[in-house]
A protein has these predicted regions:
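An N-terminal, well-structured beta->alpha segment
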Residues: 1-49
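Residue-level signal for pocket-adjacent positions within structured domains
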Residues: 22, 26, 83, 90, ...
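Glycine-rich phosphate-binding loops that contact phosphosugars or nucleotide phosphates
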Residues: 44, 52-183
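Residue-level signal for alpha-helical context at structural boundaries
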Residues: 38, 42, 61, 193-194, ...
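Internal, active-site/partner-interface "lid" segment
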Residues: 137-140, 154, 181-209
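General structural signal for secondary-structure boundaries
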Residues: 8, 32, 83, 183-187
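Secondary-structure transition/capping residues
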Residues: 35, 54, 186-190
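Glycine-rich phosphate/diphosphate-binding loops and the adjacent beta-loop-alpha structural elements
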Residues: 6, 51-54, 58, 198-209
């Protein structure tokens, strides 16, 4: 019995890895720099006027949002995590008219996110949607939309967010690269924001004496 379970587990992992590889290759082929121009432009124009960047999502995309807020911040674009459900219970108070909010939803139809995006727009903010459904409510309600779609999630039942999370993360990492390139973010500035850990050890080479 234990041997059969072990073999079933191995086969499940192998199937998921194959699925993730197929989805990654197919999705990566759809990524083009031009697709990010509008989103990056909206963020940069907002920053010039004192606006700030936020990221939000419900469920697993909410965890992607927290990671992306950290990544944007550490690469030259201060960014804030906006809790996907708390936003409609007072957390929209962190928003100021003219800010930009990136909203992540694979389906683009999640009820809680609809309420949050509506509140965001009512506070005078620009919305950049990230979704696997270009015909979704989120895509229609966004000022710019980035596609992050996959054909299957992988794993047992093909339901839990796996491959879609990889696509959403890759999409926003690409956006972070586009923004960082606009910021003239050199090693000195990077190390000043990231003095700890192995990356922080670069300070001896990067920082002036």
């Amino acid at each position: 019995m234990k041997s059969r379970r072990k073999e079933a587990s191995k086969q499940a992992v192998d199937r998921f890895v194959d699925s993730a590889r197929r989805e990654f290759d197919a999705f990566a082929a759809t990524l083009h720099g031009a697709d990010y121009e509008k989103a990056a432009s909206l963020i940069l124009e907002s920053q010039k006027k004192g606006g700030r960047l936020h990221v939000t999502g419900i469920g697993k995309p909410g965890h992607v949002s927290a990671y992306m807020a950290s990544l944007f911040s550490s690469t030259g674009n201060p960014c804030y995590f906006l809790h996907g459900t708390e936003a409609v219970h007072g957390s929209c108070g962190q928003l100021v008219a003219g800010d930009v909010v990136i909203a992540i939803s694979n389906s683009g139809e999640t009820g809680e996110l609809k309420a949050t995006v509506t509140a965001i727009k009512n506070n005078g903010c620009t919305v950049i949607g990230v979704t696997g459904n270009p015909d979704s409510w989120l895509a229609r309600e966004s000022d710019a939309c980035l596609f992050a779609g996959v054909g299957e999630e992988g794993g047992p039942l093909n339901r839990a967010p796996r491959n879609s999370i990889l696509a959403e993360t890759l999409t926003l990492q690409a956006l972070s690269v586009a923004l960082q390139a606009e910021q003239d973010w050199d090693p000195v500035r990077y190390v000043r924001c990231h003095p700890g850990g192995k990356l922080g050890q670069l300070r001896e080479e990067a920082l002036p004496c």
